[in-house]
Amino acid sequence: MRIEVAVILALLVISPALSSAGGEEGQNTPVGCQLSFDGELANESVQFQTSLGPRLPGSAASSALRESIKSNLTGWEITEKTHHVNGMVLTNLFATWNPGLGSTVILAAHYDTRGQAENDWNESRRDEPILGANDGASGVAVLLELAKHIPAMNLSHEITLFFTDGEDQGESFDTYALGAEAWADNLSAEEIDSIESFVLVDMVGDSNLTLRKTSPGDTELWNRTIDTILFFEETCGFGDSSYFNFDGMDYIYDDHVHADRLGIPSIDIIDIRYGEGAEFFGGHWHTHNDTADKISADSLQKVGYILESGLLTGDWLDARLPEVSEESKPEPLDNNPPDEEEDTEQDSDDMAVGVLLMGCILLVWGNLAWLLFADKRGEG
């Protein structure tokens, strides 16, 4: 009888300890790998948007898309602002989560499509507007899919999705990105200071996705983005990082330039080489071949993961580097960097758990051995 009791006692003591150890292992998946973005659903949005036809500023298709965006953002604070620019009526659409809570991260994409196809092989169609599956719909699709998952993140700051109008109606640099320019021109100094970062996604659906750093662009945000892409490959097992050209850089005039000129940390995540073997500003760009069949759910997912991970890990926060005078610089740190201290503390915790577990095992099995010995001698 005493042997049966001892065995039961051993199981009661050891099982919770083993379960605890196993539970800790399961909880060690880095938060940056616990992602929910669905590229297939984002691709469905691209197909819907292109089914509306070209989304020129002031058009019925543009209005229909805005209504669809709003219907997909239940619970978000929606704001529309209209601007009259160069004979066009531009409507910027903003969707905000956690309005008024701390500082703001802005994730942006343009929802208008180009009113001409000046690069199309068919000269007779160059004056016709394009469908803009990649140059228009892809960025919007990424933001809408990401928006489904933001409420569950329990973020402690404000998130604004900025759907810009009038980005793609220009003839030269100063006539592009008109909606974003109007937004920037109307910001107060206080509003500018409250914006942590401006992350733009544009032309991110190409099945031959190749991203690279763009200029102008915030160095700190780009460094974090590159670290995230490498982290996906090395830690999360999300595939290789070959879709990012780590050595290249493109100069891009896009919506982000207006945030950048105000000192807001900004980057433009864009693949301007649209199509297999395409050159800079080449391929299907500004042609009637910019259609939904050229879009890859996998490419949308790669970019969606970058944005989602950035929110979960705080990569889009605290990118502004404060100017520090010589007098106010802090004293040098000691020889234990923060991450080394954290590793030491974690190692100590793991050792303590191991010692406790081993102690429990030795105690129980020691008692069991004594009971077996006592039974043999008839002392029990």
Give the role of each language-model region.
Residues 41-51, 60, 64-73, 138-145, ...:
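Extracytoplasmic/secreted proteins, especially bacterial periplasmic and envelope-associated proteins
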Residues 40-45, 50-54, 76, 91-164:
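Catalytic-core environment of secreted peptidases
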Residues 1-30, 327-380:
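Secretory targeting signatures
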Residues 128-224:
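Acidic/histidine-rich catalytic neighborhood of metal-dependent amide-processing enzymes
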Residues 197, 206-345:
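Active-site-adjacent substrate-binding region
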Residues 55-57, 84-87, 99-101, 111-115, ...:
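Solvent-exposed loop/turn segments at secondary-structure junctions
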Residues 44-100, 238-242:
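A non-catalytic alpha/beta surface segment that caps or lines the substrate-entry region
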Residues 24-66, 279-294:
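N-terminal capping segment at the start of a domain
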